[in-house]
Amino acid sequence: KLCDMVTPQMRVAGKVLVSESGVSDTDDIKVLAKSHADALLIGTVLMEAVKPQELIAEFKGVYDNEYDKTELIDQNGLTEVKICGITSMVDVNLLIKYGADYGGMVVFYPKSKRDVTIEEAGRMVEILKKSDIKTVAVTVSPDEEQILKIQDKGFDYVQIHGELSENVYNLCKLPIIRAVNISQDDTDSVKKSIESATAMDKVVGILLDAGIPGSGKTFDWDSVKELELKEKKLFLAGGLNSSNVAAAIKCVEPDVVDISSGVEYDDVLIKGKDEQKVKEFICNARAAK
């Protein structure tokens, strides 16, 4: 009961939640797993155990199995989180640890510093799928050969920026997330792009971004209210970070918030995602109302 007093903000601040009593068997461990405690203090039952090390291993196995890694707090009805531009197994483990809903990998776009080979992406897909995290191949103006290679690696979605040719569309068997760059000085062009995308049956989501993907730039969120997305899922990207994600969710009410540069290290020479930023972003997104 007391675990309800631990707020998401306290977790983000690095407060450690310890459960200090009441453990006698694996059923108790299963109950405590729902609290997302960082540590369990177990005394008497271990002191009385014939083989305490084996009991610790059993308790830990049960706890890890019961711990719902896709939740930091109750997520029912809340905005989902997509971490884009992951480049390594270290990034993959962060998504699993903090409960991201989607993991995006940039492929066939060497201009991006986040570009990975299709083989590297495939290995990350295998691990993410085991944790029920949806996988997204992020690419720009793919050709027919590239779309086939993406499909062969078992991605759940393909996110397409730039051009989407008729041949590629017809060949694609994956659900498509169509990216649209929001330009404040060309509203008509944006509306036409969205109208075209929403008319496509294979397009299940519209991703709204500002300028160059991964640039960290925002756009006028109020402008989204004027757009007709029909029944397509709305992915909101562009300049999001842990400080503004709650405001973005409140203003736009997106289905998914999408972040890349906002969870990377301040030092541009360090590649990959910053664990503290990933944790803060996901926790703040979950807490937003």
Where do the language-model regions lie?
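Active-site mouth loops of central-metabolism enzymes
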Residues: 18-24, 73-88, 136-142, 181-188
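Conserved, mostly hydrophobic/aromatic
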Residues: 32, 43, 95, 158, ...
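Structural motif
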Residues: 12, 35-36, 98-99, 153, ...
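Conserved anion-binding
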Residues: 1-13, 104-113, 119-244, 264
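C-terminal helical cap(s) of enzyme catalytic domains, especially alpha/beta-barrels
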Residues: 5, 33, 46-76, 117-128, ...
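Glycine-rich phosphate-binding active-site loops on the catalytic face of alpha/beta enzymes
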Residues: 22-23, 35-58, 100-112, 157-165, ...
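Well-formed, non-transmembrane alpha-helical positions, independent of function
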Residues: 31-35, 58, 94-97, 149, ...
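Catalytic-face loop-and-helix region of soluble metabolic enzyme cores
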Residues: 1-42
